[in-house]
């Protein structure tokens, strides 16, 4: 165990150039910790999302446990270049991640993905199985429909509405169903998220253009999940109003080496809502 260190976004902020379909993209990432094993954290698709915003309650625990922690801003989010995606968003993210790891000289990594990040981690595992250590998937991963909840879900409808009309009122509507306990969504947190969102209107506009060009940005990988042999920990919020819990069950049913943990009193953001328990659980899984 290394000494306890507090890691900051500004001190760990870096960039790398990656070529995607003939276009050079400037990709932002945070890189901290000095461990030999790399742990990549992949964020969700909400307006204003970034690697750091999604995982700031987890970085210290993982880095201080001896991992090199890399938080990637996917193209179209955070400080990375914007892009219009007309194909599979998750396969795009997987290719970009492979390029980032190539540039950093990292051959193999553990992946932790929330929502879109979970779906992108599955896409990466399908395309680059030899480069995956272990997988942790929260609130995303298959792209398939729920058997019990009409799609798109309440949360996804609010997310898409926020992209089209990025106001504080619409942000509050989305974040209030994002987590189980809406009182944890402080005014300060909402204001920071609003500033992140409005600071990159090109991201918002290009996401809407992407949806118009291809409404199915996240394909259904259900029929291929059995190909993923890497050990996987699937974590879900019982009260997730974005991606229902039965979608997570598909991962466990179809991936041969997957375990499942369900947090009660938890929405779509398990790594934030139950950060301490989540951190312990992930570290125990990685050390097996």
Curated annotation (Swiss-Prot):
GO cellular component: cytoplasm
A GO term for molecular function: 2-hydroxy-6-oxonona-2,4-dienedioate hydrolase activity
Residues carrying the site annotation Transition state stabilizer: 115
Superkingdom of this protein's organism: Bacteria
Enzyme class, broadest EC rank: hydrolase
Active site positions: 268
Role, per record: Catalyzes the cleavage of the C5-C6 bond of 2-hydroxy-6-oxononadienedioate and 2-hydroxy-6-oxononatrienedioate, a dienol ring fission product of the bacterial meta-cleavage pathway for degradation of phenylpropionic acid.
Name of the protein: 2-hydroxy-6-oxononadienedioate/2-hydroxy-6-oxononatrienedioate hydrolase
Protein source organism: Burkholderia vietnamiensis (strain G4 / LMG 22486)
